[in-house]
Design a protein with these regions (language model features):
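Extracytoplasmic copper-binding redox domains, predominantly the cupredoxin/blue-copper superfamily
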Residues: 2, 32, 62-63, 67, ...
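Gly/Gly-Pro-rich "capping" loops immediately C-terminal to redox-active cysteine motifs
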Residues: 41-42, 51-87
Length: 114
């Protein structure tokens, strides 16, 4: 009986640790996503000035040269490719933006566009 109680207590402690770790990881991922969104908006609005050509209501941009991003449904990988290599009249940002900035602006656009 004592051994059984001990095993239950050990199991309970392990479950508590797992719950704590999951909570911590969830909190970290939320903070990471928020900072990535902030960097993405900064790159979109200021460094790359995407809003000069593109409409994206969430960013307060209403450019009419490139596609209206509010009406697009791109995969993040497609956005990364376009930002990195350019497409049509859109310039390539490889060498202008860091890979972190390219990923952040792509994440931002993929999350904020419809």
């Amino acid at each position: 009986m004592i051994k059984s109680k001990y095993l239950v207590q050990q199991f309970s402690n392990k479950i508590k640790k797992i719950i704590f770790i999951l909570f911590f990881l969830t909190l970290c991922s939320t903070v990471f996503a928020d900072s990535k969104m902030d960097l993405g908006l900064e790159v979109y609005s200021n460094k790359a000035q995407c809003g000069v050509c593109h409409t994206l209501q969430a960013a307060g941009s209403f450019g009419d040269i490139g596609p209206n991003l509010d009406q697009m449904n791109f995969q993040m990988s497609q956005i990364i490719y376009a930002v990195t290599n350019g497409i049509g009249v859109m310039p390539a940002y490889e060498g202008i933006l860091t890979s972190e900035e390219i990923e952040a602006v792509s994440f931002y656009v993929s999350e904020k566009s419809n």
